[in-house]
Amino acid sequence: MLDKVKREVFFVARLLVVLYLSTLLLISYENVNYIAVGILSVYFLINVYVYFFSKPRILQLISPFLDIILVPAFVFFSKILYSIYALGVLISVYAWRKPVLAGIILLETYGLAFFYFSGHYLLMISHFILFLALFFTSYNFEYATVVGKERKRILKLKKNYHKLLKEFSNFEREKRMFSNLRKILKLLRESKEPKDYFEGLKREFNVKRISVIPVNEVEGEEVFDYDKGTLSVFVKLDRGYAKVVYELDPPFRLRDPVLIQALVEGAKLLSLYVEGFEESAEGKQVLVVG
């Protein structure tokens, strides 16, 4: 509702500016500048289109730029002294809503005042004072103070909200980790053989395939192959080492750090079932689940 009222206020202000400048053109019809007429026509037509027909927000953002470009251009090309006062309307309408734009228009007004009154310094200074007074009297300091406080409050709420989301995310992650640990410990308690244990891991964590391979050399604690969707975990046994290979489907599950941590911890518990393997079994799959 407030945005609609604001939009209507701006449109009426621009319409009054067009009517005022059109009246000045009619008064000076004998020496009319057609560039100024073209500028005013474009300004009017675009504002009407934006107000009545534009729904995309990008079109509504055009109007302020028209105010700070086309109206000062009209004042410059028309050579009509009284047209400079139309900028006072724009300064007034922007002063408490968008003070930065009002300041830009004020500076443009100063430049045009210098253009028109460069030979009459007191008259030029009086116009400087007039438009500056118009800016300050139109600026709502109470509104600006309230908006400033609300802005700080909103930024603080936004910061606290992001902090809360981060804490909630950490809580959910820890909850998943604890749940996975419970599943692994339950499987460890209920499984008597490595095969039963890894079948339980496959079922609980939806793993496509699990292989256990005796090795002599360790390439690292974990090795990822994102193309094949495999995770290799090297486990130290009492006699030698073993490599537990998980095949995940789809492969992007390798990007889940909580799942990977659970699979790594689950693989390391192989040492509780197996002391080691025969040398003849090196490099061969001694256990395949899936």
Swiss-Prot record:
Topology in the lipid bilayer: Multi-pass membrane protein
User: Could you list the residue ranges forming a coiled coil in this record?
Assistant: 147-183
Q: Which GO terms describe its cellular component?
A: plasma membrane
Give the location in the cell: Cell membrane
Record key words, sorted: Cell membrane, Coiled coil, Membrane, Transmembrane, Transmembrane helix
Q: Which parts of the chain span the membrane according to its record? A: 10-27, 32-54, 69-91, 100-117, 121-143
What is the protein named? Answer: Uncharacterized protein aq_1842
